[in-house]
Amino acid sequence: MVLLVVDTQKGIVDERLYAFEKFVSNIRKLIRTAREQGIEVVYVQHDDGPGTGFSIGDDEFEIYSGFAPLLTEKRFVKTVCSAFKKESGLLEYLTEKGEKDVMVCGIMTDFCINATVEAGFEHGLHMIVPAYANSTQDNEYMTGEQSYHYYNEFLWPNRYADCVPMDKALGLLKK
């Protein structure tokens, strides 16, 4: 198993996210537990391209300090919603390692997390989504809360991922 931390970058990790404090706390617990158990933590960062303010070299592109990777932890960069798009190299990396179980956390629920969960499933990976370890902001169609519940409680379970309570997620990391 690997813990995949998606798009937790300075420019978008803030109070605009649904259930912000719980989200931050849960991701910190997941990262800490994975490291304690010797489970690899892998980071993915979204790059909107040069001149956007959200690209390699920009401060907003960097990982939020509360989730900062260790120097030894892998980072992948993507330019589309799915972390598994060929250009990122993530799928090839996991395939070479023989990893099939991916616990995913991060942002945005309705964009990059959804695309990553569905693409991972389509590539034959067992996707695990811990409760309140993904979040998003309000948009013109749904609040962040509505988006969170739609994906975590309706769309992903029994289709694309095992959506599990935090205590179960932590237990899976401890096996």
What residue ranges belong to the model's regions?
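N-terminal nucleotide-binding beta1-loop-alpha1 segment
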Residues: 4-7
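Short acidic, Gly/Ser-rich segments with clustered Asp/Glu that frequently serve as metal-coordination loops
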Residues: 9-15
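Active-site-adjacent betaalpha module
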Residues: 1-2, 29-32, 54-175
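Catalytic metal-binding/acid-base residues of hydrolase active sites
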Residues: 9, 47-48, 81, 108
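Phosphate-coordination/substrate-recognition cap region in phosphate-metabolizing enzymes
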Residues: 51
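A short alpha/beta connector and helix-capping loop motif
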Residues: 16-47
